[in-house]
Amino acid sequence: AGEGNGRGPYVQADLAYAYEHITHDYPKPTDPSKGKLSTVSDYFRNIRTHSIHPRVSVGYDFGGWRIAADYARYRKWNDSKYSVSIKNLQRRTSNGNRRDRKTENQENGSFHAVSSLGLSAVYDFKLNDKFKPYIGARVAYGHVRHSIDSTKKTTEFLTTAGARGTDPTVSSPYKNTQDAHQESNSIRRVGLGVIAGVGFDITPNLTLDAGYRYHNWGRLENTRFKTHEASLGVRYRF
């Protein structure tokens, strides 16, 4: 049975929709970093994605203030991109011969917020017997993994014009270059966030909860990660 004045331990289960913003500070393509040149495109430097994930919480209601520990695991994001372009470097109008450069870029990237273990303090505003808006703050220990494998290959080749009525001849590549950037990290950091929402008491012990939370996962070496989450769940007080 629950304690008087709405006090007592509780459990809560939520389904959350998260908007995730991931920013990677990879070396710029034109600037050397540790003797290497980055080949990573803007697509993998500034990622915006979303996911749906469950969240569970265990806490104690003090009759106004609530303190809870929560755990969530996010969906893994991964993608790949391939691009190719051909640029003419030289053309002889006298004989039709030309020199071209072919550039290929293959990228494979992933990001996974493996887990978030948080502790929150929330204050409920009792408007009436049913509705209770709330605000709060949250500190969390997060674990993320991310990787990038980007390879840029350039090939120069010569095209010789054939005799009238014949196809031109493409010579074997005579100049090849290849640059690559590989990086893989597993990082754990403490981050801070804010919480807001409203609870609706279905029964004295069962509450329907609609909430929002913003969380900054902290400086993850060369990565910044922020989430905006909207959730719907139920809270049961013992």
Curated annotation (Swiss-Prot):
It comes from the Bacteria. Disulfide bonds: none annotated. One of its GO terms (molecular function) is porin activity. Belongs to the opacity porin family. Its main location: membrane. Implicated in a number of adherence functions. OPA proteins are implicated in pathogenesis and are subject to phase variation. Residues 168-183 have a biased composition (Polar residues). This is Opacity protein opA66. SUPFAM superfamilies: OMPA-like. Pfam families: Opacity. InterPro entries: OM_autotransptr_brl_dom, OMP/PagP_b-brl, Porin_opacity. Residues 88-109, 162-183 are annotated as: Disordered. It is found in: Cell outer membrane. The keyword Acetylation does not apply. GO terms for cellular component: cell outer membrane. Keywords: Cell outer membrane, Membrane, Signal, Transmembrane, Transmembrane beta strand. Residues 1 form the signal peptide. Gene3D superfamilies: 2.40.160.20.
